[in-house]
Every structure is written in C-alpha cells, then in structure tokens.
Amino acid sequence: MIDAVLFYVGLSMTLVGGVMDVVAAIGFFKFKDFYTRLHAATVGAIGGGFYPLVGLALMTLSLDIALQMKLTFAGICLLSAAIIAVGVPSGTHALARASYRSREAKPVVIGDKLREKLEGAKN
C-alpha cells in the first residue's frame, strides 16, 4: 500500500516538474525584460529540476528491487535535488546582481532601493 502511495506521489511530482518546465519555457519567450526572463529560467530550473528528482527518488523507493540499489539511487537523486535547490537561486542572484551593477540590462522598476543604497555608499 505504501509503495503505491510513494509511486503516485513521485509520479505527480515528476508531472508537476514537467508542467513547470513548459510554463518556464513559455515565460522565457514571452517576457521581454532580462530580469523577468531570468525569473522564468529560474522557475524552470527549480521546478523542472528539483521536483522531478525528488519524485524520481520517491518512485525508486517504491520499486521491488534490492534495498541497497533503492537507497543509492534515491540518495543520488536527493543529493542532486539539494544541489539544484542551493545552486540555482545563488547563481541567479549573482547573475542578476552582476548585470545590474554592470548596467548591461536596464531594469524597468517603480522604485530602486538598491541604487539608492549603492549611491549612498559611494558618497
């Protein structure tokens, strides 16, 4: 019984990841600004990478194979998901900040607290 629940929860997480990848691809081509495109790419990387890996780990735990193989494969999937969960937001933040500071991409904003802070630090 628990195997079926694990399998279907994992399958649904994998499907959610696929849907998020499609939504991110549509957003990436629809948005015109660098920062909103970067946001769409991050949603695709997190949603399309993290959730399917966790779902795959759950589906693996529900299989009828040797315990060592189950735990090894599930552990690799969960470790990869953890690396994605930590690395993608950090990389996206670094990319957005570098783009902002080099003034390569002009943000369309209503208020800019970061510019005020940076100008205050220069004076």
Where are the predicted features?
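Loop-to-helix transition at the N-terminal end of transmembrane alpha-helices
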Residues: 35-49
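N-terminal signal-anchor/start-transfer transmembrane helix
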Residues: 11-30
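Transmembrane helix-loop junctions in multi-pass membrane proteins
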Residues: 25-33, 60-65
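Internal alpha-helical transmembrane segments of multi-pass membrane proteins, especially GPCRs
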Residues: 14, 39-43, 79
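Juxtamembrane loop-transmembrane helix junctions in multi-pass integral membrane proteins
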Residues: 1-5, 30, 36-39, 68
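Flexible extramembrane loops and terminal tails that flank transmembrane helices
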Residues: 2-8, 58-79, 84-123
